[in-house]
C-alpha cells in the first residue's frame, strides 16, 4: 500500500518538474525571440512614440518586488501582465491609425506568448491584484476618459512598450 502511494508521489513530482523544466526551456529559448518581434511590431505599427505621459504612474514597485520573487511567481507575473495587455486591446480601436497588419501580428504574438505561459502555471495560482488594478486604471483614466481617441491609444502604446521591455528583462533574469 505504502509502495503504491510512494510511487504515485514520485510520479507526480517528476511530472511537475518536467512541466517546470519545459516552461524554463520555453522561456529561455523562445520568450526573448517573440518579445523582440512584438516590440519591433509595436514600434512599426505607429509613428514615433508620444512624449506625453499617461496620467497613471508606471508600477515600478511591482517590478522591483517581482525581481526578487520565486520562478513560478515570475511566470505568473509575465502571464498576467500579457493577459492584461491583451484585454486593453479588446477596447474600441476605431480611432487608431496604426498599420492594421502590424497590429494584428503584434496581438497574435502576444496571444502565443500567453498560451505558452498559461501552460506553465496552474490555473489555481492567483495573479497580483495591484497589477490588475493598475491596468483597470490605465483603461479608465486613459482610454475611457479620452474616449478611445487616437491620442489615448498612443499613450497606451507607450505604456505597453515600457511593460514589454520590462517583461523582457524579467524573463532574461529567470535563467
From Swiss-Prot:
Disulfide bond annotation, renumbered to this chain: 24-120
Signal peptide: 1-23
Keywords assigned: Antiviral defense, Cytokine, Cytoplasm, Disulfide bond, Secreted, Signal
A single cellular component GO annotation: perinuclear region of cytoplasm
Gene Ontology biological-process entries: defense response to virus; positive regulation of gene expression; positive regulation of protein phosphorylation; type I interferon-mediated signaling pathway
Tissue spec. comment: Isoform 1 and isoform 2 are expressed in several tissues, including gill, spleen, intestine, kidney and skin.
Family annotation (InterPro entries): 4_helix_cytokine-like_core, Interferon_alpha/beta/delta
Gene Ontology molecular function: any one: cytokine receptor binding
A Pfam family the protein falls into: Interferon
Induction per the UniProt record: In the RTG-2 fibroblastic cell line, isoform 1 is highly induced by polyinosine-polycytidylic acid (poly(I:C)), a synthetic analog of dsRNA, that binds TLR3. Isoforms 2 and 3 are also up-regulated by poly(I:C), but to a lesser extent. In vivo, all 3 isoforms are induced by poly(I:C) (in anterior kidney leukocytes) and by viral infection, such as that of viral hemorrhagic septicemia virus (VHSV) (isoform 1>isoform 3>>isoform 2) and infectious hematopoietic necrosis virus (IHNV). However, induction kinetics is isoform-specific.
Function, in words: Key player in antiviral response. Induces expression of TLRs, including that of TLR3, TLR9 and TLR8a1, and that of cytosolic pattern recognition receptors, including RIGI, IFIH1/MDA5 and DHX58/LGP2. Also induces MX1 and its own expression. In the presence of intracellular IFNAR2 (iIFNAR2) and IFNAR1B, intracellular isoform 3 may mediate STAT1 and STAT2 phosphorylation and induction of EIF2AK2, MX1 and RSAD2.
PANTHER family attached to this UniProt entry: INTERFERON BETA, TYPE I INTERFERON
Leftover remarks: Salmonid type I IFNs are classified into 2 groups with 2 (group I) or 4 (group II) cysteines in the mature peptide. These groups can be further divided into 3 subgroups (group I IFN1-a, IFN1-d and IFN1-e and group II IFN1-b, IFN1-c and IFN1-f). Each subgroup can be represented by several genes (up to at least 7 for IFN1-e).
Similarity annotation: Belongs to the alpha/beta interferon family.
This protein's name: Interferon a3
Record organism: Oncorhynchus mykiss (Rainbow trout)
Lineage: Eukaryota, Metazoa, Chordata, Craniata, Vertebrata
This protein's encoding gene: ifna3
